[in-house]
Amino acid sequence: MSGGLDILRLTADDVSKMLAASAHLGTTNVDYQMEQYVFRRRTDGVHIIDLRQTWEKLLIAARIIASIENPADVCVLSARPYGQRAVLKFAKFTGASPIAGRFTPGTFTNQIQKAYREPRLLIVTDPRVDHQPITEASYVNIPVIAFCNTDSRLRYIDVGIPCNNKGAHAIGLMWWLLAREVLRLRGTISRDTDWEHMPDLFFYRDPEEVEKEEQAQNNKWAAPEQSPALSAAVPSSAAPVEEWSSSPSKETTEWGASNTAAAAKSSWSNETGGEWGAQEGGEWGS
C-alpha cells in the first residue's frame, strides 16, 4: 500500500520499536486465513509475523480512518485491560469515540437503550475478546478494523492488522503507530519531525504500581528538608544542656550540708531543755 514511495516505507526506527515491543511474535497456533502473514516458525513453535505486511495493513487502516470526515464517527474499542489505556489515548489524539472495558450488548443494534451508537467505523484490539461488537457491526454493515494475531479469525473483519495483540507493550505500540499515521495523513503533524508523544504513553500501567508511585511522591513532599539558613544559625558545637532533675547541683548540695551541720550544733531542745527542767524542778521541790 506504500506504492513504492520512500516517504511511506517502513523505517529502521519503526522496525526496531516493533522488535523491542515483541510485536512480531505470534502464537503457537495459526489460523488458515492468517498463514499468509506468517514469516516463519521457530523451533519452540511460535510463529513470526512479517512486519512488512503489518506496516502495509497499518497504512490501509490509517487511510480508511483519515477518510472519515467526522472523527467522532470512528469507534475504538478494547475489552482487554492491556489495550484500554491505548484506546483512550488514541481517542484523545484523533477525536474518536472510545469504549474501554466491557461492551454493552445491543450498543449498535438496540435503538432503545441510551448507549446506542451509529459509528461509521469500528476498530477493535482483539477479535477473540471483542467478538460481540464485531458480530453486531456485521448486522448493521459497519466496517471493522482489527489487530489480529496468528490464531485470530478474520470473519466479519474487513482489515486485519497482523501483530501481537496479547502483549502490553505490543498493543500500546501498534495503537501509537496507527495514531501517528492518521495524524500525518490529516496533516496535523509533519513526517519530517518525530512525534512529541512517546509510545510508552500508550502502554498499560498496573494500578497498584501507579498507587505506590503516587504514595512515594506524597511521602517525599510531606517530609520537607531542613532549611540551610536554619541549620547554619544553630552552631554544631553548642554545649549540651544538662538536665537538672537527673543530678543535684553543687550549690544545692553544699547548702543542704551546711544547714544539717548547723542544726546538729544548735540542738538546744535536748540540752537546754534538760538543764532547765532539772534546775527548776530542784528549786521548786526544795
UniProtKB/Swiss-Prot annotation:
What is the originating organism of this protein? Answer: Trichoplax adhaerens
| Assembly notes | Component of the small ribosomal subunit. Mature ribosomes consist of a small (40S) and a large (60S) subunit. The 40S subunit contains about 33 different proteins and 1 molecule of RNA (18S). The 60S subunit contains about 49 different proteins and 3 molecules of RNA (28S, 5.8S and 5S). Interacts with ribosomal protein S21.
- Please list the residue ranges that the record marks as compositionally biased, kind Low complexity: 227-241
Residue spans of biased composition, Gly residues class: 274-286
Q: What Gene3D superfamilies does the database record attribute to this sequence?
A: Glucose-6-phosphate isomerase like protein, domain 1
Quote the cellular component terms of the Gene Ontology held in the record: cytosolic small ribosomal subunit
Q: Which UniProt keywords apply?
A: Cytoplasm, Ribonucleoprotein, Ribosomal protein
Record-linked NCBIfam families:
uS2_euk_arch
Q: What name goes with this protein? A: Small ribosomal subunit protein uS2
Region Disordered, annotated ranges: 213-286
